[in-house]
Amino acid sequence: LKRKLTSKKASRWLIVGIILILCGIVATVWSVNNSKKKTPHHKLKPQPALIDNTSTRPASYTTKEFKNLLSQNYPDIYKNLNFKQKPTFYVIPGLIQSAAIKYTPPGQGQPGIAYDMDPQGLAIIDHKYLIISAYSKSKTFDSVLWVLDFKTGRFVKTIALNNIDHVGGITYDEDHKRLWVATINQEQRAQVQSVPLKEIEKYNFKKQKKPIKFEHGTNLSAPLRTSYMTYHKNKLYIGYFDKVQGGQLFAYKLNKKGLFKKDKMQDGLALPSENWSTYSQIQGISFDKNDILLSTSYGDLNSQLLIFKNKLNKPNYNLDLSEADKTIILPPYMEQIIGKDGEIYMLFESATALYRQNPNLLHMDRVIKLKVKFKGLENSKE
């Protein structure tokens, strides 16, 4: 009898042991599979400080310093950042130095290094890339595009352009896989040029040592210059402002191929299908669901994000400051914005070489993401 009891106890302990081993194996497999599903941002090795002569590190602050300064100076902005979805910030490359094509002699037309690049435009490509456009403040170098990995924030490459334009407006047409860039023609009038995604992915500045080629270009009848631009539902929305005449926004309807309609041309200039008056200090525009987002900035005063319900189809409707449904205060020198998936991506130029000399300025050396459903101090009609 004792032998039987001892045998039963041994069998029980053996079963318990097997169960524990199986649980351990299942837990290990689940842990490994789960870790593969998530992008291990915290395990990514730091990139080199320079990649092909373009700086990849923040120009002004460490991540900890940046968070502290933003939370101290703009606490409501800080509270509305999305810390759950990584990356929280995108470091703006090229602010310390950037590869570029020399515009002026000596070395005109040759690759060189620019130390005064000023970020202006922002675009997101298929949740794959985030692109920042920049121009040389001294006009010594041609303008560039910096390409970042959208999911990790890591720098990918620099794309050289064949002009010294402000490139304040860039936008991606996800329907036709085409990036549009606002430029200026030889008559100093506004034009837009495009490059297909496949060419962006193929381009290698280090090997080619020359600017990327635009595929299409169209001269515009209005505005005379371009301050900002966005693509939305087969239309390009292009705007401009000056301090005297205020702001204007023009819509250009594209054809099925995503290009300007030939029957909407006059004297070689594309004609807009619609136009609206806007607030006079608009730097960026974007659409997100039923909202229109406008960024305003001028000088070293605080910037503003204006959120409107989309009523562009209503007659006599204008995007004036008084019509905004919500106004959010942000740091100075905000440029282009993008509304996407309930978040607003914001680019600033306050960390350029020129503005870094101002010790009283918060140098926004990163693109930040703000929730559209902002909670905090704001002016709202709701």
Language-model region placement:
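Sequence/structural signature of beta-propeller modules
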Residues: 2-109, 366-382
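Beta-strand-rich domains and repeat architectures in extracellular enzymes and scaffolds
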Residues: 59, 63-70, 102-141
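Surface loop/turn motifs at the tips and blade-to-blade linkers of beta-strand repeat domains
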Residues: 110-115, 159-163, 217-222, 273-278, ...
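Structural signature of eukaryotic scaffold interfaces centered on beta-propeller domains
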Residues: 112-126, 168-177, 221-237, 283-288, ...
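Blade-loop segments of beta-propeller domains
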Residues: 117-120, 146, 150-178
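Structural motif
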Residues: 139-146, 187-199, 244-255, 300-311, ...
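Loop/turn-rich, solvent-exposed surfaces of beta-rich toroidal or solenoidal domains
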Residues: 273-315
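Conserved blade-ending motifs and adjacent loop-strand segments that build the rim/top face
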Residues: 277-278, 315-341
